[in-house]
């Protein structure tokens, strides 16, 4: 809450501040505050009316489903079953580079993600190029 709102919300502080204003100024502020409060009330009632209308429509659709012999839970379950299909997995990328690690094992790398430390070290210290590690077909 801002300092101005804290002042407006505290009756003692508000009285102290009001002593410094004329009655005309206080009445003008009151009119403006009433306008703001009325606007807020209208917004709140409009939002409540929207919620009520939505609830009414949902109830109407539910009654229509029941009249047609369809259980709403059955409809929800069928929608969930249709939606819950697993995401298609993408194919693994083929290896593009081959290298020998510190343990003497031959490993491969697709070229995606971080460069393996062995390749990085060879490129920095031994002046090798990435093309030197390409898998030849």
UniProtKB/Swiss-Prot annotation:
- The membrane spanning regions, by residue number, are none
Molecular function, one GO term: minor groove of adenine-thymine-rich DNA binding
User: Which positions does the record tag as DNA-binding?
Assistant: 112-117
Protein localization: Cytoplasm, Nucleoid
Please indicate which residues carry the site annotation Interacts with Hha. 12
Q: Which InterPro entries match?
A: H-NS-like_N (IPR054180), H-NS_C_dom (IPR027444), H-NS_C_dom_sf (IPR037150), Histone_HNS (IPR001801), Histone_HNS_N (IPR027454)
Asked if the keyword tRNA-binding belongs to this entry, the reply reads no
Gene3D superfamilies noted in UniProt: H-NS histone-like proteins (1.10.287.1050), Histone-like protein H-NS, C-terminal domain (4.10.430.10)
Entry keywords, A to Z: Cytoplasm, DNA-binding, Repressor, Transcription, Transcription regulation
- State the GO CC annotations: cytosol; nucleoid; protein-DNA complex
One Pfam family matching this protein = Histone_HNS
Give the record's family classification.
Answer: Belongs to the histone-like protein H-NS family.
Function of the protein: A DNA-binding protein implicated in transcriptional repression and chromosome organization and compaction. Binds nucleation sites in AT-rich DNA and bridges them, forming higher-order nucleoprotein complexes and condensing the chromosome. As many horizontally transferred genes are AT-rich, it plays a central role in silencing foreign genes. A subset of genes are repressed by H-NS in association with other proteins.
The record's subunit annotation is:
Homodimer that oligomerizes on DNA into higher-order complexes that form bridges between disparate regions of DNA compacting it. Interacts with Hha, YdgT and StpA.
Q: What is this protein called?
A: DNA-binding protein H-NS
